[in-house]
Amino acid sequence: MAEAVIQIEVVYASVQRQVLMTLDVPAGSSVRQALALSGMDREFPELDLAQCAVGIFGKVVADPSTRVLEAGERIEIYRPLLADPMEIRRLRAARAREKRTLPG
């Protein structure tokens, strides 16, 4: 009897390009196992799948080694932030204040 498989998607977007791949993985596979099967680290050599944050449909997966996948789920590999979001908001607010206080 053939092993049951499920179909999932794995997605990653670098600055230069985006890849969305559909994979058939054994039923009961963890997120970590599916990432290893995806070969995304071969597509993007700078990617360290053991260290990257990952999520499923926008929700971060706390422990990819234990989270079992269901058919149709999409694993998203997240890049590290380049800037602190709080600092960006602070700078944007300061620029807006300057514009309001300028004469003319």
UniProtKB/Swiss-Prot annotation:
Source domain of life: Bacteria
Name of protein: Protein RnfH
Xref: SUPFAM superfamilies: MoaD/ThiS
Family named by the database record: Belongs to the UPF0125 (RnfH) family.
Family annotation (Pfam families): Ub-RnfH
